[in-house]
């Protein structure tokens, strides 16, 4: 179990003297989050509430029809993401924002005994036990992480090269739980995309240099952990 602790920095007062010139100041405005946390919620635990999935996380693969005359191949795959990576990434992203006094990550998969992947909310007793054991005020649970990849190779006649792209859309779902409350306080469904590309003189060369399936799932799972943060905290 990893903990993230932060110290509050005390800023000294600034001595303002007289000046003869006036500078134009720019002010950055923060946009409100979709979720509002009471001031009493200062310590949060990020937990993995997904079942273990097989090493092969591919759900389904579809070879699609080419959508332009310059396309050589197009393949769409659907995956379960790596929940452990996404949970850790989410905890780190929350900690980096310095919004909460403490962010704790629970590495264990709470649904590790599930045979088939499924969404299952935490019970009131589970939430109470976790918040007490982890000494936190509330929980943010990763409930689901799925992704869709679109792998495409095209010929670029103006440049005389082949261009390979991998575009992955991630769909993380997180829920917020408070102790002594029946069911989650709120569910946040979010999505975003991450992109890779390679160019070369031959189709085979481009295929071999495009990101592998294993690395794609790892990097997309890590990226997915950062996506819900802008819905949870001001930005």
Task: Give each language-model segment a name.
Residues 1-8:
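Bacterial N-terminal signal peptides that target proteins for export
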Residues 15-18:
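C-terminal motif of bacterial Sec signal peptides marking the signal peptidase cleavage site
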Residues 45-48, 139-143, 169-175:
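Soluble periplasmic/extracytoplasmic beta-strand elements of cell-envelope proteins
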Residues 50-141, 145, 181-186:
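N-terminal segment of the mature soluble domain
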């Amino acid at each position: 179990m990893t903990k993230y602790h932060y110290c509050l920095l005390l800023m000294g007062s600034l001595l303002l003297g007289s000046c003869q010139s006036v500078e134009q100041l720019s002010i950055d405005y923060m946009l409100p989050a979709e979720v509002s946390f009471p001031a009493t919620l200062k310590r949060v635990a990020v937990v993995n509430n997904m079942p273990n999935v097989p090493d092969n996380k591919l759900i389904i693969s579809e070879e699609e029809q080419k959508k332009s005359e310059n396309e050589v191949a197009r393949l769409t795959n659907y995956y379960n993401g790596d929940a452990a990576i996404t949970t850790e990434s989410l905890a780190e992203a929350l900690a980096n924002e310095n919004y909460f006094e403490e962010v704790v990550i629970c590495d264990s998969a709470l649904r590790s005994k599930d045979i088939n992947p499924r969404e299952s909310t935490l019970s009131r007793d589970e939430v109470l036990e976790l918040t007490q054991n982890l000494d936190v005020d509330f929980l943010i649970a990763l409930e689901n992480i799925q992704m869709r990849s679109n792998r495409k190779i095209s010929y670029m006649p103006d440049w005389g090269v082949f261009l390979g792209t991998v575009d992955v859309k991630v769909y993380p779902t997180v829920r917020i739980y408070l102790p002594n409350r029946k069911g989650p306080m709120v569910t946040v469904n979010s999505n975003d995309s991450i992109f890779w590309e390679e160019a070369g003189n031959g189709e085979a060369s481009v295929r071999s240099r495009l990101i592998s399936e294993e690395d794609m799932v790892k990097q997309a799972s890590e990226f997915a952990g950062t996506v819900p943060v802008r819905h949870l905290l001001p930005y």
